[in-house]
Structures are given as C-alpha cells and as structure tokens.
Amino acid sequence: PDTTYLGPLNCKSCWQKFDSLVRCHDHYLCRHCLNLLLTSSDRCPLCKYPL
C-alpha cells in the first residue's frame, strides 16, 4: 500500500501520530516502539541500522 502520505509525522512501526518521535536511519519511531524494539535487539528491524 502507498504510505507516502503518512510522512515523517508518524511512527513507522505503529503508524500512529505522536509528538515525541525519534529519528531512526531513514524513518521515525515513537518512544514506545523504540523502547519495545530495544528490549529485543540493538538494531532496528525495519532498516537494520543500530538504534
């Protein structure tokens, strides 16, 4: 599906709009998803770069 309209104002993991987005390599994550992802690995499962 075309998700280009979501832009950088959405978390790429849960796609919700949040005020506290953290930039990952080429996308953004909300703090909630970032904390969940950090519990399983130090690399982002979406872009494979270090969190």
Swiss-Prot record:
Its main location: virion. InterPro entries: Z_RING-type_Znf_sf, Z_RING_Znf. This is RING finger protein Z. Belongs to the arenaviridae Z protein family. It is a lipid-anchor. One of its GO terms (cellular component) is host cell perinuclear region of cytoplasm. Transmembrane segments: none annotated. Plays a crucial role in virion assembly and budding. Expressed late in the virus life cycle, it acts as an inhibitor of viral transcription and RNA synthesis by interacting with the viral polymerase L. Presumably recruits the NP encapsidated genome to cellular membranes at budding sites via direct interaction with NP. Plays critical roles in the final steps of viral release by interacting with host TSG101, a member of the vacuolar protein-sorting pathway and using other cellular host proteins involved in vesicle formation pathway. SUPFAM superfamilies: RING/U-box. The keyword Zinc-finger applies. Gene3D superfamilies: 3.30.160.310. It holds the Pfam family zf-P11. It is found in: Virion; Host cytoplasm, Host perinuclear region; Host cell membrane. GO terms for molecular function: RNA binding; zinc ion binding. The gene is Z.
